[in-house]
Amino acid sequence: AYPSRQCTLWAYLRRSQLSLPVGSYMGNGADWANTARGLGYLVNNTPHVGAAMVFARGQSVGGHWTADWQYGHVAVVERVNADGSVLISEGGTGFATFPAWETISNAGAYQYVHY
């Protein structure tokens, strides 16, 4: 299972709310892309609503902050905007709210898991 209030728990819960499949344990945030590939899911750099958005260890999260150097980060795409940016929902102990929401402008720089 996933630790309380962490990004992985939120991604699991949100995809469940959306009636989208997600494995019971995909690893740490940065691991979701490789785990999904191993399970036969498509992983690429094209966002779509409901996709798990994967941030590598230490990767900039839209220029706002940096994903954890040990665990990385994972979020869920809520909307793809006309300008190519994405609105994401995310969890993690560093946020004041659970979930938190933010817009990422350089959406093509990240990996997306398409279940």
Q: Which ranges hold each PLM region?
A:
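Aromatic- and glycine-rich peptidoglycan recognition patches
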Residues: 78-115
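Secreted/periplasmic proteins that engage bacterial cell-wall peptidoglycan
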Residues: 1-82, 89-90
